[in-house]
Amino acid sequence: MAEMKLYELVNHYHIGTELTCAEAMFMACNEYYHLNLSEETRKMFSVMGLGMQTEQSCCAAFTVAVGIIGLMTAKEGQTDVSNMEGYQMIAELTDFMLGFYGTVHCVELQKLEELLAGRRILRPANGGQLSC
């Protein structure tokens, strides 16, 4: 069996499961990038998919993806302002989300998901690969 693309793993962990979007993103990134992050780390993200669902909140899956980008690009002892690679990747991810979905807000994305019920909507052109 061929290795799944990142978006396919996200769909695998999220569609038809009890996992929140945040947990699905975490599980997919952890597996895809062989991060070997602990169950304790997963628990840190687990409430995001439940508690961020307000009209003003950012998508929890997006938030987890930003955290994973930071994890993969930050250097030991490096401050935020020094991580230009991470900032560039986050800017590209934000541009993709806004261009493809028109929003990063949870409620608006859920409405899109309801409109496309039964279809898998997380399909970035590059398969969601980070090039670190």
Residue ranges with predicted function:
Residues 3-7, 36-53:
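Short, hydrophobic/aliphatic alpha-helical segments
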Residues 17-37, 92:
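An acidic intrinsically disordered interaction segment
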Residues 53-64:
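Conserved phosphate/anionic-ligand binding catalytic regions in large, soluble enzymes, centered on
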Residues 63-72:
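DPxDG-like acidic metal-binding loop motif
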Residues 32-43, 71-89:
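Phosphate-handling active-site elements
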Residues 88-132:
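C-terminal binding/interaction regions
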Residues 1-17:
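Polybasic, low-complexity association/targeting segments
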